[in-house]
Structure formats: structure tokens, C-alpha cells
Amino acid sequence: MHGKVSIQTVRKTIRQDPNTRKEIIVCPGGAYATLSAFEGEPVARFFAGQGWNTSVCEYGVEEKARMPGPLLQLALAVAQARRENDFVAVCGFSAGANLAALLCTRYEEAARLLGTKPEAVRPDAAVLGYGVYRFPAGMVPQPAEKFGQVSGQSDLLPKCFRPALRQTAQGDRLDFEALMLEYAAGRQDPSADEWRSLSPAELAGPETPPAFLWTTREDTMVPSEQSLFYAQALWAQGVPAALHLFSRGDHGEGLAEQNPESHFWPEMAHSWLLALIGTES
């Protein structure tokens, strides 16, 4: 239900210390079709180990992914965390990064629908990994090699991913951008206005929270240019944004513990957040 809405609480607390006063809410990826386990609790536990209060937002997927449902679920999670913390950041991956950035750019709308004040649901910062921030880029015909190759394993895919399969001369491939848009819009042929409403790079303003973005050039599911789109949108509005593009690494790395190049990103994000808190205190 949406209106002055009744939204199910989906904030799973991992660590809550009343003396800490700062929290990170993690939004796993999964193309709005599922929630990736290794992009949720493991990430929250890393930041908990760095002294943060942490939680995971288990937002709606598949038929429950239609906006503004997940947007309001994350907004409610931020509002809950805000009662217990002075600084609240959101951290998302892939579709979760899209969702986190959407709240950063649509928090006033979310507050209105929840019947609360914008400052209650506005994150103080966002940490975003390999997300989609401008959907029209994924809606134009693309070369087959743009999509992530499934290498003949399409029969092993979860059913929720099969709508994204594209037959190519090289084999079955996944178009994650199109799949995310379909689930978030709730239909296969969203209008131009719906494209824009789901594209944070089109919605950024001077009050959009600062962001730390990271991605890899080898990502075949979501082009690395997507992160540049959002960073440029923030820079154009005078909003601080850090963009880290690693040369190697696949989509969906999470903590990237097996990647010798990008596994530093969590420490980098932690340092960036502490510096941001220092400038705001």
C-alpha cells in the first residue's frame, strides 16, 4: 500500500551500540529479482568491525520490487536508524546501489509518502558499488559482448533471472540493466518518465548526499560508465563524490576479498566516511 503508507519493516540489525551513534545500512544487489547474500551481512559485519552500527535492508524483490515499494522500505530503515544514530549512511551494490541512490535523490518524495520529515529519511552519505544510475543507457540495442555471458548455464539460473536472457551468437547472456528496470517499473515497457524516475543520475540536486562510488572496468553486467554518470551528476551539482574505477574484477564482487586490486575498497570507503563525518562535525 502507498499513500500515507503502511510499509513492512525490513531493517535487519547486525550491530547496534547506543554509544556509537553512526550506522551503515547495507542494500544487497540481485537485479531487483533476488537479494545477494554475500552483498548483505558480510558487508555489514565488515563495517561493524570498524566500529559502525550496521543493518541490512531486505527490500522487496520480483513482484514486490515495483517502486516506490523498495524506496519506502529503505526510507523507513533510515528513519529507524536516525532515531538511534547521528550519522546514517546507505551502502548498496548493483540494484541495491540503484535503490540507495534513488533514496538519496527522492528522499523528499519518500518522506511525503511516509508522512514524515525529509531530514528523517535523507541519508547522510552513500557508498555505491557497480550500480545502475541511468536506465536509458541500458534500453538501446547493445553489442552482444556488453552482456554478462552465462556460458551455457542458463538452465541453472534462478527463474527470476531468466527474463533477462538474450540469445546471441556467443551464447546466452544476461541484460541486467533491462531486468532491473522491468522489475522496478513493474512492466516491460516503462515510459520515458518512468525511466527518469528510476535513474538517479537524472535526479541529482544540490541537496543530494555525498557518494563514494566504485566499480571495475571488466564488469560485463553493468558498464563502468554507469558509475561515472552518477559521479558527474553529483559534481555538476557541487556535491562531493569520490569515484574509484578498478581495472580488474567481475560484477557482484561484494567485499572483493579475492580481487588483489579492488579488495581495498571497504577500507577506502570507511576512511572516506570518517573524513566526511569530520567535515560535518
Task: Label the model's feature ranges.
Residues 1-281:
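Alpha/beta-hydrolase superfamily serine-hydrolase fold, recognizing
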